[in-house]
Amino acid sequence: MVFSSTIFLFGFLPLSLLIYYVMPMRIRNLALFLLSLVFYGFGEPTYVAVMLFSVTVAYLTGFPIGKYRESNPKKAKFWLILSVCLNLGMLLFFKYTNFFIENLALIPPLSGVLEPMEGLTLPIGISFYTFQIMSYSIDLYRGSTDTQKSFVSFGAYVALFPQLIAGPIVRYRDVDDQLMTRTHSVDKFSSGVSRFTVGFAKKILLGDSLAAVYAYLGTVYAVEPTTLTAWLMVLTYTLHIYFDFSGYSDMAIGLGRMIGFEFLENFNYPYLASSITDFWRRWHISLSSWFREYVYIPLGGNRKGLPRQFFNMGVVWLLTGFWHGASWNFVLWGVFYFVILALEKAFLLKWFEKNTATRALGHIWALILVGMGWMIFDHTTLSEAFAVIGGMFGLGTVGFASPTVGYELSRTLPLLAVSVIAATPFPARIMAKLESSRPRLAVLRPVLIGVALLLAMAYMVSGTFSPFLYFIF
């Protein structure tokens, strides 16, 4: 079940909110846990058991970790390693088994001997909830949080349906207090509804519309590759993935507020970044901070000299690529960013920060490289990715433009213009300025949100099913 579906919007969501609010406070976590299991099991009930196994392992090992972390650190570390290995092992098995089998089978002695496991599919959201579970075990070992004694409350944390499928990755210590006591108010609920609606509109009205344009441009480029088509493909996908993923995050944060939770932000206008380093402070913030805290810093971070720092960065970005998927294009995507970030760390960042002109160049640098990176990210066949990237610079094309792509550009220019503006903070700033200067215009916000909701619902009902991109990770 996904947020942008009729069964969720008109069935599961209102029913869940009704059940949640009629329940006494003391059993609301139980209600959330059971509702989240129903939400998760709607699409693939067999994998509910996989998630419950991971929850049970982390919950049970949490007791000895918390008990021995001070009196017997070695024993606590044993239980930590057991928890991490079992949970990470589940992720590795389901996500990467067939990838490694298929690649090992390319070696002549193993060709025909190794066969992919039939019927092995990836449990939805396993990459996200595994990282959440690991954050609990690691933080508990470090003494950053306390042992959760309630299986129901811990299960509710892991399975919480607003962020179960595609994040944000919520660290346990960021919500441990909220699991016990959280505030509910009309203002908080209405804020959640507004945030959910904004995300829903971003996903349906902009993200899905851009996805359709991108798919069409891909077919055009395969037949008649031109430089303009390549650039339009990069632009539409760059905007599409932002509105799709940030839209989901907005919806998750909004849903969380409706039931009293406050999740950390996952995006901060990433396409305004002044460098690739800055971009990764703004894009998928929960994933970047997770790798920084649980991989990069434990490896030594930037404390052991530049060569070791580059090694640590390489490990992080190799894992980041693999986390996104069991395919070589994701590995290359991670390596691509490692190389760029290493160059920035070595000397480019200082140059970008020299003056206004170099900062502007840094912004252009970031936008072009991010767009190129998205082509690697989207194409599992690397030759197709390289063809589009080469086409951006006139390599392998039949010219700069064609009548077909010229017509498509004129047809989609309003969508592209609205999308570019919506990817910046300007709409929010203009609205805030209007509300502060003319208080009567405060009514404009709910009206616009209501219109956006109706338009998005109409588009969703009349359109085809389009799951979130990060749904598959």
Predicted region positions:
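Membrane-embedded transmembrane alpha-helical bundles that form the catalytic cores
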Residues: 1-472
